[in-house]
Amino acid sequence: MCYIMDKVGILKSDRIEQTTLLVNQNKIEFMRQSMDNIKFMRMDLSSYLITPGYVMLDFSLHSLLPFQDFKQQIIRYLKKGCTSLLTVVDIKYEKELVSNVKKRRHLMINSPIDYFMAVKLSLKSLNQSVLRKCKQQQVSIVFVEINKDDRLDLTSWGWIRDAMFSNPITLIPFTSDESLSPFKKNRLLQEWNRIVREHRISSLYEFLEEGTPLSKEILMKLGIYPVKGDIRVGNKLNYNLYKLEELKYHIDGKPIIQHNEISPTFTSHNGKLININGNILFLPGKGEECFISISGRFIPQSASF
């Protein structure tokens, strides 16, 4: 079925512009400023701001989670406008990787939204073998836990880089050391960044926050954008709608969306409304696992390392 999302506000170059979307078979077929000459059913969205469906990070899910607990945790994300989840599997020993990833995939069969798989392991567990197993399991995101006592310079980074060659794997620094002051945490991150840049390893240069939308820049680096995290022709219909009158604005007119204070009025996943004013439609099994074919897409080569 074709219909038109008419005159919805979209953020472009730090300001809101009105655009009109032609939707066909739950995909965006056409976008332009107006489509007054096209005769299809219209939805007047002139009082709304549209954003892409959010991709969010989660460390809390685990394979032994009962369905009702799993459902409640996922609903928290749906209320925030999340339409794709980056779920992280904790790996203590390399031999656990295959079985733990398999268990997480079994848990996510019930997911109502799309999801990407990632693993988290300690620095001492990071080696060529574990990265090859990640490739075999089609896992392209690896969180590396680093703490104050870790000696980053003692890791065989040259071997790590060789194992990542031609693999769409991105390393992400992570720390759970609560004893670290913000200053020491920043020093630890600086040391990580120095090492991965020196060895030209595909990595993020910041710690990521759970339960908040991942930025466009992060999604680009991971290889998730533009399939997710963008409103563009050809993409599936994953979006959030916010009432313009409920938003706060910067002096320059750019809207402020504080995700801990305001939730989207509507959320669509693949063309199906799953959030209407906080009322959640939980459809088990409607989500699909997504895979990353190329990391760092649409990033200039000079900015990749």
Residue ranges, per PLM feature:
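A generic structural signal for alpha->beta connector loops
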Residues: 39, 112-114, 168, 264, ...
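Active-site microenvironment of metallo-dependent hydrolases
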Residues: 1-37, 57, 61-64, 70-86, ...
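Short, charged N-terminal helix-start/capping segments
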Residues: 11-20, 45-57, 74, 154-173, ...
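Alpha-helical scaffold segments that flank or form the walls of functional sites
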Residues: 27, 38-117, 122-136
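Short secondary-structure boundary/hinge segments and terminal tails
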Residues: 95-96, 152, 285
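Histidine/acidic residue-rich metal-binding segments in metalloenzymes
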Residues: 99-113, 117, 124-207, 220-236
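Short secondary-structure boundary segments
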Residues: 89, 146, 244
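Positions that flank functional sites
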Residues: 92-93, 149, 249
